[in-house]
Amino acid sequence: MAENVTSAKATAKMVRVSSRKVRLVLDTIRNKSVAEAFAILKFTPNGAASDVEKVLKSAVANAENNFDLDQASLVVSEAFANEGPTLKRFRPRAKGSASPINKRTSHITVVVAEK
């Protein structure tokens, strides 16, 4: 009943960045090798790139430690970001009114698999 596991997953929840911004970064690394994905993320001038890099690093560590997979043969097979809960705040405005401010969060998931 021993299955041959060829993929590992990592998730970061409640990350304080909009899922729309994270998806732009994830689209650049999907279906790339892990080494190439790290190189892309290192030079991406987007704030979400550092959060995605942390999740990718965690997924690679999970693959190496839990499933004895080789980092050189890993590919980013899945990468997606879902919406997390929105923190709702209010900014005081003129004449006693207030404007809503939505601080959006996201759940980032990265799955790495062997080629």
UniProtKB/Swiss-Prot annotation:
Assembly and partners are described as: Part of the 50S ribosomal subunit.
Q: Which CDD domains does this one have?
A: Ribosomal_L22 (cd00336)
Q: Which organism is it from?
A: Limosilactobacillus fermentum (strain NBRC 3956 / LMG 18251)
Q: Name one Pfam family in it.
A: Ribosomal_L22
PANTHER family the record matches: CHLOROPLAST 50S RIBOSOMAL PROTEIN L22-RELATED (PTHR13501), LARGE RIBOSOMAL SUBUNIT PROTEIN UL22M (PTHR13501:SF8)
Q: Tell me what this protein is called.
A: Large ribosomal subunit protein uL22
Could you tell me the gene encoding this protein?
rplV
Identify the GO cellular component terms for this protein: cytosolic large ribosomal subunit
Family of the protein in this entry: Belongs to the universal ribosomal protein uL22 family.
Q: Which PROSITE patterns match?
A: RIBOSOMAL_L22
Q: What does this protein do?
A: This protein binds specifically to 23S rRNA; its binding is stimulated by other ribosomal proteins, e.g. L4, L17, and L20. It is important during the early stages of 50S assembly. It makes multiple contacts with different domains of the 23S rRNA in the assembled 50S subunit and ribosome. The globular domain of the protein is located near the polypeptide exit tunnel on the outside of the subunit, while an extended beta-hairpin is found that lines the wall of the exit tunnel in the center of the 70S ribosome.
Keywords from UniProt, A to Z, are: Ribonucleoprotein, Ribosomal protein, RNA-binding, rRNA-binding
> What InterPro entries does the database record attribute to this sequence?
Ribosomal_uL22, Ribosomal_uL22_bac/chlpt-type, Ribosomal_uL22_bac/org-type, Ribosomal_uL22_CS, Ribosomal_uL22_sf
